[in-house]
């Protein structure tokens, strides 16, 4: 996997609309021709991509969605190689059919697939250090809430698990992962000061040697896949 970062953005975000601006700024070089946004939610990417004179289609459930689609119901109703780039942000972790959906993203794309996945280990680590997510639930999208949730994550995994999964499924579908990065991966766990150094040392002593303690502070991870010629 290429560690050089071809795609980056200096924009900060604090909610979904500002995150869409960051993602567009980061990947605009390959958001060309035609883009399929799988799980487009409130279509935050739509205006940004259309402003570049690029065809954009958003599917899933959400406000002003182009096509309402149950993403558990596969295959998706699109021809193979019908979009230059396929986006799938914050979606796969919600699906029972994660592996089949991954194959569909690769089938529909003519060149690029961009995927994001959360880091549940980081969320769990934060709960241990800082407390529960809310009064009613220890972790967002996990746990055993009293009321049946409208939505939840189906999978619990580490950043290393996610990297391995994406790499293997990409290879299976004749793609190469040309970039992987994560929110917060430029700053080591606990920061660069003495406190951070001591904290990382303690964790290395407490945890198994193969645990990447720095990854416990990483947020969402992003993967850019390119179809092999």
Q: In which residue ranges do the predicted regions lie?
A:
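Amphipathic alpha-helical segments that form well-ordered structural scaffolds
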Residues: 22-26, 48, 161-169
């Amino acid at each position: 996997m290429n560690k050089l970062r071809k795609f980056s953005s200096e924009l900060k975000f604090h909610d979904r609309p500002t995150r869409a601006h960051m993602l567009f700024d980061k990947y605009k070089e390959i958001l060309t021709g035609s883009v399929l946004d799988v799980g487009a939610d409130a279509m935050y990417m739509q205006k940004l991509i259309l402003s570049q004179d690029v065809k954009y289609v958003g599917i899933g459930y959400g406000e002003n969605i182009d096509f309402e689609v149950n993403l558990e119901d596969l295959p998706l109703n699109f021809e193979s190689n019908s979009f230059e780039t396929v986006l799938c942000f914050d979606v796969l972790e919600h699906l029972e059919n994660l592996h089949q959906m991954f194959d569909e993203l690769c089938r529909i794309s003519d060149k690029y697939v961009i995927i994001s996945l959360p880091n549940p280990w980081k969320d769990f680590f934060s709960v241990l250090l800082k407390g529960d997510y809310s009064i009613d639930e220890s972790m967002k999208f996990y746990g055993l809430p009293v009321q049946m949730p409208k939505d939840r994550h189906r999978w619990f995994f580490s950043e290393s698990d996610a990297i391995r999964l994406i790499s293997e499924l990409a290879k299976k579908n004749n793609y190469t992962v040309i970039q992987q990065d994560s929110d917060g991966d430029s700053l080591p766990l606990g920061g660069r000061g003495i406190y951070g150094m001591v904290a990382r040392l303690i964790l290395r002593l407490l945890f198994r040697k193969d645990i990447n303690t720095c990854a416990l502070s990483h947020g969402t991870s992003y993967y850019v896949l390119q179809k092999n010629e």
